[in-house]
From Swiss-Prot:
CDD domains tied to this protein: Macro_Poa1p-like
Keyword Hydrolase: yes
Biological role stated in the UniProt entry: Highly specific phosphatase involved in the metabolism of ADP-ribose 1''-phosphate (Appr1p) which is produced as a consequence of tRNA splicing.
Reactions accelerated catalytically: ADP-alpha-D-ribose 1''-phosphate + H2O = ADP-D-ribose + phosphate
Record-annotated Macro domain positions: 1-185
Domain of life assignment: Eukaryota
Keywords: Hydrolase, Protein phosphatase
UniProt protein name: ADP-ribose 1''-phosphate phosphatase
InterPro entries in the cross-refs: ADP-ribose_metab_enzymes, Macro_dom, Macro_dom-like
Species the sequence originates in: Chaetomium globosum (strain ATCC 6205 / CBS 148.51 / DSM 1962 / NBRC 6347 / NRRL 1970) (Soil fungus)
Gene expressing this chain: POA1
Family: Belongs to the POA1 family.
Protein residues bound to substrate: 13-15, 27-29, 34-39, 142-148
GO molecular function: phosphoprotein phosphatase activity
Parts of the chain that traverse the membrane: none
Length: 185
């Protein structure tokens, strides 16, 4: 059987206007800060999920986290009125730090594929464990904002990677995981 791959389609609109059980992916630093750009929008819409992310970062060193991912299931606090819509949050740890201390673009790109493969494995494991199927996969144009990596470079890196056994979520059709990359209108 051929390895599974991601197929990324670009769209313009609201990343967060998604049905329940959608996976929303963004690139993150490893120090527990969602303080600017799209990460700040995630923090404002998903405060309980932000606390899970921050605690995860506090338990590890930046070098341990870079190139990995965190899957955050919908948190009850977000579902009860603070903005969350029953969305899973996928955090790709592609840079150790943020701002002027962010990793250089080549290092961020080297971390992007392994982080996405790890996230797909976490999604497959979550689906197996809970019986809940992720219905849709969305992401922002990862790394292209405050990490200053050209979107086309990240997109190429993601579409070139192969998903192995245990890394293919249930939403894959014919060996392809459809991912919609959203850019704000």
């Amino acid at each position: 059987m051929s390895p599974a791959r991601l197929r990324i389609t670009d769209r313009t609109g609201d990343l967060f206007a998604a049905p329940a059980n959608t996976l929303l992916i963004h690139a993150c630093n490893t120090v527990g800060s969602w303080g600017g750009g799209i990460a700040l929008a995630f923090r404002n819409l998903y405060p309980a999920e932000f606390r899970v992310y921050r605690a995860h970062c506090a338990r590890s060193t930046p070098n341990q986290l870079v190139g990995t991912a965190l899957l955050i299931a919908p948190q009850r606090a977000s579902l009860n009125g603070s903005g969350g819509g029953g969305h899973y949050i996928g955090c790709l740890f592609t840079s150790r730090r943020f701002g002027a201390a962010r990793d250089p673009p080549d290092r961020i790109l080297r971390a992007t594929g392994p982080a996405m493969r790890h996230l797909m494995r976490l999604v497959a494991e979550e689906e197996e464990r809970t019986g809940v199927r992720i219905g849709e996969v969305r992401m922002c144009r990862i790394n292209a904002g405050l990490f200053a990596v050209p979107w086309e470079s990240s997109k190429r890196a993601l579409e070139a990677m192969e998903l192995g056994d245990g890394e293919v979520p249930g939403c894959a059709q014919g060996g392809v995981v459809e991912v919609v990359a959203w850019e704000r209108a």
